[in-house]
């Protein structure tokens, strides 16, 4: 929240007004000009830093150290002893002289893990009290501040048994254990009365959407030794209000203003906040101030959305979510911050844009991630839902360094006090974000009942959105069933797995984390972190960049097995990569699509994961270099608002509709053999109610007329014949088969693999490719001039040096073209520089470079 220094507010109630108050001093963000150094080296040259940053974040990003840290296994050799001792952060800054009656607080939004703090040589906080990364602290420094100031912060890293930022098994532990000032530092100004934690809540008429009711809430603190009378004022586009408040000397009180007290809080024809696939994410801003004696004592700008979120349970007991009266199928993925918490605002904006581009609508934050509120601001702006809660990091001894029982590691009264206060701080910090639709009390395990009761008491006091006890399927004695599930898998499973009633991870209910394991980056990314002499064969350097899980998932053996059994192995690195990409493409798409087919039995799916904290080969829709994986493009296709989907379980086509309007369309299917022979040409009308899945017709009976493999081409057309969406599949004569008795938490064993080895003999296709640029949009036309399918054609936009241009938002990628088919693909890119080119290549298509 930021100060607003000139409010001109006309009272909507009462006989007095807030007009033309004297402005106040703006808050100051202390971000630039910091220096850091280890305690034992304070007499040496200090490193420059910008806050927020961890120690490793500053050493790498701002001082150029450890440039090859992520190459091969180099990270294993980093000297971690240098972070065993405390590090100092220091900065100098100037401030305007305080006005009469003015007060100033020094606020820290997040430090890991402990800190001693001095301002102008006077200690204002001790590490015995200032600890816990998710606590937020504010200190009155009115009597210490000067016009020129020096701030020194001594930070101590996490120690075993403490509750730190929650990286788990998707990357190695941060070398510095995230030690540092990882969230903003502020100077906050006010007069006698300060405003804390202002919030705007909304209720909505979810039938006609023509009116909403707002409640404004703020905690007011009178720091003076006398009674203060004034007005809590608000101004937004619907009008203004002024609510009289009198505070006794030293009093702190939470004030709530409702439409009964301020009629302007009853909003007619509101602009609603929707997730992007249902509408526009409309936002409002409200200036909230406390005015006394004609002066603004304190003020904040609050951004908020008018929306109403709720939940429901289907017949099988699984939870789903309702936004503005509409049931929403959650389609999302799990977030992680960078390993050294170096996420820039620009990177956050792009990553959320990727979620939107994939036609997903949700991010799960298994941790209250973010070095500021920016990532949640982006979710608000771009219409992406957010599920926010604690990480399983605190539930297992291997990560926390403290024994766990069935409630995890948070066990003592001191632990419960720290975590419950952290819960309060984080919810107060984030509760104005309309994108956040649920708080998670835990991840893998239930929280201890005494801790959960604290959570529930806090929520009853400060927030009203849905809460679930954890991300699994357990039932709490206090809050009831979680209504979700976390049974995996986390490793590759055959596409039909998701449709099988026997599968633990079948596409029923709300699966809060699941994925197919290895999601291989493209060659251009791979060579940045795998040493050249270790690129082939795939070995230890690759395995080091999988996961740190102890039981499984720590090597590429499963992917190698799939490629060997389904494709007959790989002849070289490029062959391995394309087969890894196809494995990712069809496996990830099937996981998402099965949940769309199975609504309303399915209520949500979270792909594990969205992104990576470092260069990785596992669990990612795009890599650490922000280049999409093959799964990105299959999810983009599978999540198209209206789509045709092939059900691997019953061999039928389904029409699905995720938008908020009913539609009627025409479904078409063509099937081709390996030799390009047309096996089937069928069509049907598809009536597609909002939020529905409609069974259409059977594909060729399994095995009938299929010679090794069959290619399916599906199109959905509107009543004017315009293609709304496309989907392409390659199907083997016989499906993979699982042994359902051999279940482990990461996968169910596959006993028989589908045979796609015939793809190795697919005849060469002749593709004519051309390129034009119209209104800064790149258009590439692909014409298949051959009599066979042009399979798995990939387009890459590169600069003159051969580097991938990021971002490059293609309309589609990894496409297949039927014999004689022509497709036009478009691309919106961050830039189209001179010398750039598009590389076109495919499974059976020769590489062609289209130069600008």
Language-model features, listed with the residues they occupy:
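Active-site-adjacent substrate/metal-binding segments within catalytic domains
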Residues: 65-94, 99-108, 113-119, 125-128, ...
